[in-house]
Design a protein with these regions (language model features):
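Domain-level signal for Mg2+-assisted phosphodiester chemistry and nucleotide/NA-binding surfaces
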Residues: 1-100
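Extended two-metal-dependent nuclease catalytic cores across DNA- and RNA-processing enzymes
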Residues: 2-6, 34-35, 61, 85-177
Length: 177
């Protein structure tokens, strides 16, 4: 039987921040030639909070830990071309203020030079957080971590044992993913 008081939802914060802030952007056409985007910071915060509540109820988790990416990244030190193709992609309008709100209102984990999914892997496999843990993400790369995962786009758990996680990691390594 699942004990919600001994169960933590490990949230892929980067993905959830991006999804919520993108969903709340609204385009407005002012005239034949002028478009703008606007977003309500309050509505974006409410969307994020509602999403956390929704999944914590489904997953029976009373504890929430949100993993965030560091501003610095060791992969960029190794290869300056890492995610180079994304350099011109803008962040959604309310991404930065939502991130700050999340840091003030939830238990967040951020580690120097690591991305949020790296932090999720550490939290899922270490004793930093006690009890049962469920990763909430959309990122298929989490299948390289021995853990219990709930993919936001699905409706069931994925349980990844250590052998399967190692296999998935090697496949990604060999295919350059």
């Amino acid at each position: 039987m699942i004990n919600p008081n001994n169960r933590t939802m490990l949230v892929d914060g980067d993905i959830l921040l991006y999804v919520c802030s993108t969903q709340m952007e609204e385009p407005i056409k002012w005239d034949e030639d002028t478009w703008t985007l606007h977003a309500s910071e309050r509505k974006t915060i409410d969307k994020f909070a509602d999403t956390i509540t929704y999944y914590s109820q489904i997953l029976l988790c009373n504890n929430i830990a949100i993993a965030l990416s560091s501003k610095t990244n060791f992969r960029k030190k190794i290869s300056p071309l890492y995610k180079y193709g994304r350099r011109n992609n803008r962040k959604p309008l309310t991404f930065a203020p939502l991130r700050e709100w999340v840091k003030k209102n939830f238990k967040t984990y951020e580690m120097p030079y690591l991305e949020g999914d790296d932090v999720l892997g550490i939290l899922a496999t270490s004793d930093m957080i006690k009890g049962d843990k469920v990763i909430l993400t959309k990122d298929k790369d989490m299948k390289t971590v021995p853990s219990t995962i709930w993919f936001m786009q699905g409706d069931d758990y994925t349980i990844v044992d250590e052998d399967t996680a190692n296999y998935n990691h090697m496949i990604q390594t060999l295919t350059g993913d």
